Amino acid sequence: MFRVKILVFFLFLGVASFATNNSPFWGQTGHRVVGEIAYNHLTKKAKKNLEKLLKGEGLAIVSTYADEIKSDKAYRKFSAWHYVNFKDGEAYETGEKNPKGDLIQGIKECQKIISNPASSEKDKVFYLKLLVHLIGDLHQPLHTGRAEDRGGNAIKVNWFRGKTNLHAVWDSKMIESYNMTYTELSTNLDYFSKNQKAAIQKGTIIDWANESRELALTVYGSAKINDNLSYRYMYDHFSTVKSQLKKGGLRLAKVLNELFG
């Protein structure tokens, strides 16, 4: 009986590990890396104001909140804020807008509510948590992908022989395969010269969206339906993932410093 209990225990650990490593949530790790890098580049004033508003919760921890509430029907109206679609060769400014909102509209609405002195503390906290997440989404190229394939979700591929889709490969699979915690990865990525930081933080939300869109077109050309992706794909593309995480963190810091610093 004792041996049976031990076997059941280790089977449970295996299932739990599998579930963790196949997280649907950039995955949780990616968003937390963006939040952690951003926190490291806040001004003293912004850091103090944010810590007071979030009551000690770190940006890395709140970065996944917008995904955690997705299953709650009360928050379904925010679903369209996680992505933005515009046609190939078309700039966001001139394209047709989603009447339900989109990633760029969502970011701007968060900024508006947070900066409004009349907004309640509860609303500021809620929209701040969304903002932290949405800036991360903006830097995952396929969150600016094509509507017809739902940002690569409809492009079925294999990742190390496991069935998945192209969106998930860029959201979480490559990051999880790198096998670092968010603190390890953020520490590994958080190095910039003064000039590099200034160059990355230059521009507007729309500029950054158009930049991600250009990357998305490259991502679409990187794989076909039913492709078997593994080490070579990781070698060719993980540098882009790391670059986008770094950009997301520094740009989130810029946005938050403007709001709170």
PLM regions: where:
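Bacterial Sec-dependent N-terminal signal peptides
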Residues: 1-28, 261
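N-terminal, motif-rich segments that launch catalysis or mediate targeting to/interaction with membranes
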Residues: 20-132, 146-261
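Transmembrane alpha-helix/helix-exit interface in multi-pass inner-membrane proteins
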Residues: 142-143
